[in-house]
Amino acid sequence: MTTTIPIHLRSDALNASILPRGATLSAVRFTQRSENLVLGFADPEDHFRIPVYAGHLVGPVANRIKAGEIPLDGKIYQMTRNENGETCLHSGPDGLHTLDWDIVARTDQSATLQIDLKDGDQGLPGNRNIKATYSIAGACLTLEIAARTDQPTPMNIAAHPYWMLDGLSDVSSHLLEVRADSYVPTDSRNLPLGDIAPVAHTEFDFRTLRPVPLTPALDVNFCLAPESHTKPQSCARLAGSNGTQLEIATTAPGLQVYNGAFLPDLKGVLENGHDLKPYGGIALEPQFWPDAPHQPGFPQITLNPRDTWRQITHYRLTPPA
């Protein structure tokens, strides 16, 4: 299908591939090297058959929503409880990651994809138009997402690539730095407790570069700012054992970090016949803080008519020496 035929972007330093279904980032490579720096499947259809959100844009409401309920303007909007029958994760089984986006502009260095959601889609209000533009300049891949609506509606879209910079068996070979002083504590369902906590003297202190842990499972939202920035701000650095480095700058007020603890063990499904395994990639997801509609002290995610929701993220890569 054409929606799983990749769009290829090129610069003098990087190549990237995007699948129109899910606006999925399926490959990032240095021009002079063959290794894929994100999890990419040998069969592009496996990006959608294997439910790990690899490379997808997730939303319109990323992360977890308690009971799948969105309180808005005196009403409760019900989303699908697709996680243990209790929470809605990434807008349920029919979210943006499953949809066939239209290609509305394309050059060798950039591609813009678009999707329209009708009023009531995913149980949410408003006719919504969402555009995602991937572009490459030198060794920097940029993703800009913009959304508009004709009714107040929640909006929190996140990119979900899994990074693996050195091709080794798990992410414990990587070093991670997250420039955040606080994080969102959660309960056993990974729903916020309602406060934020300092990272100091906790397992979540990544303010200096240190190894990505395998235990306990890491799936936490770091608080980058109390609201969105107008321009991308540096927030994280990831370094592979071979010297490859990734720097992330974003306008988003949060960064969800997931160390891939619950990725399935599947033989030969990745490019070049490699296996997919637990901890086989790390997701670094700029976004708003989770379950914001139920947390009045968090940055809020309501998009109003005549406003534009916008998020810009730069992924700057440095090759091995």
What residue spans do the PLM features occupy?
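An exposed, glycine/acidic-rich loop-and-rim segment of catalytic or binding clefts
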Residues: M1-A321
